[in-house]
Amino acid sequence: MATAESRALQFAEGAAFPAYRAPHAGGALLPPPSPAAALLPAPPAGPGPATFAGFLGRDPGPAPPPPASLGSPAPPKGAAAPSASQRRKRTSFSAEQLQLLELVFRRTRYPDIHLRERLAALTLLPESRIQVWFQNRRAKSRRQSGKSFQPLARPEIILNHCAPGTETKCLKPQLPLEVDVNCLPEPNGVGGGISDSSSQGQNFETCSPLSEDIGSKLDSWEEHIFSAFGNF
């Protein structure tokens, strides 16, 4: 009985005079808790650093960014694919347009801006595409002229492969014929006389005849084109 009373007395003295807590790590002394604080339930455990930072009056600050290795992958290096508007579209020429352009090319290989604009109005093609066509046509003509200067086979070798009585035909030089250029005959009274009858026969054999519709279109186009040359 006496032992129980002594323990109750010690508990009452401890509640009335609680011991001071040790100094906090921050250096500030916490006030002693009141006797009623011992009877209250303990607060839930929370994040210690954030509570301590708020107690000292400092903002914990934003969270550190994630490491670079965990970020989104960088896009692959290199030139981006060209869009559909940046891609060059190939121009398809009709048979009438090609015949007219070849006809003008036989007259002049370097048409000026006025002639190109007239061709653009007749063929319904952009003037820039007509200029590119003449550039490509001049390059093609230079390549073909370079091939024409290649040495031909010796006459005695050709005679060995010819049948008897056909030596004169074998001695005739076999020059490459350009169908798209020579298909159109020289117009009478413009820039010269009539071409050789033998060359006209070769052109007639190698070229396919034009239809009446295309021929009528070319005739009407020639009148407009030749008027642009003047005294050419």
Swiss-Prot record:
Q: Which Gene3D superfamilies match?
A: Homeodomain-like (1.10.10.60)
GO MF assignments: cis-regulatory region sequence-specific DNA binding; DNA-binding transcription activator activity, RNA polymerase II-specific; DNA-binding transcription factor activity, RNA polymerase II-specific; protein homodimerization activity; RNA polymerase II cis-regulatory region sequence-specific DNA binding; RNA polymerase II-specific DNA-binding transcription factor binding; sequence-specific double-stranded DNA binding
GO cellular component labels: chromatin; nucleoplasm
Q: Name one GO biological process term.
A: hematopoietic progenitor cell differentiation
Please give the function described in this protein's UniProt entry. Answer: Transcription factor that play a central role in proper axial mesendoderm morphogenesis and endoderm formation. Required for efficient differentiation of cells from the primitive streak stage to blood, by acting early in the recruitment and/or expansion of mesodermal progenitors to the hemangioblastic and hematopoietic lineages. Also involved in the morphogenesis of the heart and the gut during embryogenesis. Acts as a negative regulator of brachyury expression.
Mod. after translation: Phosphorylated at multiple sites.
Q: What is its main location?
A: nucleus
Location of region: Disordered: 22-92
Q: Does the keyword Transcription regulation apply?
A: yes
Question: Which tissues and organs express this gene's product?
Answer: Restricted to progenitors and secondary lymph tissues. In normal hematopoiesis, it is restricted to immature B- and T-lymphoid cells. Present in differentiating embryonic stem cells (at protein level).
Q: Which residues form a coiled coil?
A: none
Alphabetized UniProt keyword annotations = Developmental protein, Differentiation, DNA-binding, Homeobox, Nucleus, Phosphoprotein, Transcription, Transcription regulation
Does Phosphoprotein count among this protein's keywords?
Answer: yes
Q: Sorted alphabetically, which InterPro entries does this protein's record hold?
A: HD, Homeobox_CS, Homeodomain-like_sf, MIXL1
* Highest taxon of the lineage: Eukaryota
Q: Which family does it belong to?
A: Belongs to the paired homeobox family.
Per UniProt, the ranges with Low complexity bias are: 48-57
Location of Phosphotyrosine modifications:
Y20
Q: What is this protein called?
A: Homeobox protein MIXL1
Bias (Pro residues)? 30-47, 61-76
Per UniProt, subcellular location reads as: Nucleus
Q: Which residues bind DNA?
A: 86-145
